[in-house]
Amino acid sequence: MAALAVSGLSQQVRCFSTSVVRPFAKLVRPPVQIYGIEGRYATALYSAASKQNKLEQVEKELLRVGQILKEPKMAASLLNPYVKRSVKVKSLSDMTAKEKFSPLTSNLINLLAENGRLTNTPAVISAFSTMMSVHRGEVPCTVTTASALDEATLTELKTVLKSFLSKGQVLKLEVKIDPSIMGGMIVRIGEKYVDMSAKTKIQKLSRAMREIL
């Protein structure tokens, strides 16, 4: 039964991918492969949107969908398992029409509703955003400090971080404040992770002292 369910989902996603583009068109592969249900839907959407040169438009529309689904009234209705699927489909159809979403985004939302996959919508949106980030050559970087950085220090930090990038890559920096690290900073850029926090240094010193004693 599980195999049949997966097969059925794959077929429905393929149908969605070709429903708004010419039949038998070659699938456009996204720049990064994401597995799972969200990956299947996001890949189909990326392929269809790429062929119509509407990747950026669909990305903006999906962000709007995410905002709408966070509204208490909408979330209570659409994510409630006791609300009939037909009611959810009608509600979403009205919403996409009101927002004037493209057929690409509207078809995706309707398909998720019809398949009872609305709870997967945030994950699908996240997967598509990841694909778009890689498409733009963005390299995610998170810097955590104990206190806010001044402009001069932040500018210097950006210069250093950009020196690690390859040609065509774009730094996507997020700065977080976490007083618990006590000082220094923690940097995560791409797959690299460097912990230069005072907290970690103190912990290492503490372990070293215990070994000596």
Curated annotation (Swiss-Prot):
InterPro entries hit by this protein: ATP_synth_OSCP/delta_N_sf, ATPase_OSCP/d_CS, ATPase_OSCP/dsu
Positions where N6-acetyllysine occurs in the chain: 54, 60, 70, 73, 100, 158, 162, 172, 176, 192
GO biological process: proton motive force-driven mitochondrial ATP synthesis
PTM entry text: Acetylation at Lys-162 decreases ATP production. Deacetylated by SIRT3.
Top-level taxon of origin: Eukaryota
Sequence motif SIFI-degron, location on chain: 5-23
Compartment(s) where it occurs, according to its Swiss-Prot or TrEMBL record: Mitochondrion; Mitochondrion inner membrane
Signal peptide: none
Cellular-component GO terms for this entry: mitochondrial inner membrane; mitochondrion; proton-transporting ATP synthase complex
N6-succinyllysine modified-residue sites: 90, 100, 158, 162, 199
Alphabetized GO MF terms: proton-transporting ATP synthase activity, rotational mechanism
Record bears the keyword Mitochondrion: yes
UniProt keyword terms in alphabetical order: Acetylation, ATP synthesis, Hydrogen ion transport, Ion transport, Membrane, Mitochondrion, Mitochondrion inner membrane, Transit peptide, Transport, Ubl conjugation
Gene3D superfamilies (UniProt xref): N-terminal domain of the delta subunit of the F1F0-ATP synthase
Regions that span the bilayer: none
Transit peptide, from-to: 1-23
Recorded family membership: Belongs to the ATPase delta chain family.
The protein's role, per its UniProt record: Subunit OSCP, of the mitochondrial membrane ATP synthase complex (F(1)F(0) ATP synthase or Complex V) that produces ATP from ADP in the presence of a proton gradient across the membrane which is generated by electron transport complexes of the respiratory chain. ATP synthase complex consist of a soluble F(1) head domain - the catalytic core - and a membrane F(1) domain - the membrane proton channel. These two domains are linked by a central stalk rotating inside the F(1) region and a stationary peripheral stalk.
Assembly information from the UniProt record: Component of the ATP synthase complex composed at least of ATP5F1A/subunit alpha, ATP5F1B/subunit beta, ATP5MC1/subunit c (homooctomer), MT-ATP6/subunit a, MT-ATP8/subunit 8, ATP5ME/subunit e, ATP5MF/subunit f, ATP5MG/subunit g, ATP5MK/subunit k, ATP5MJ/subunit j, ATP5F1C/subunit gamma, ATP5F1D/subunit delta, ATP5F1E/subunit epsilon, ATP5PF/subunit F6, ATP5PB/subunit b, ATP5PD/subunit d, ATP5PO/subunit OSCP.
Full protein name: ATP synthase peripheral stalk subunit OSCP, mitochondrial
Gene: ATP5PO
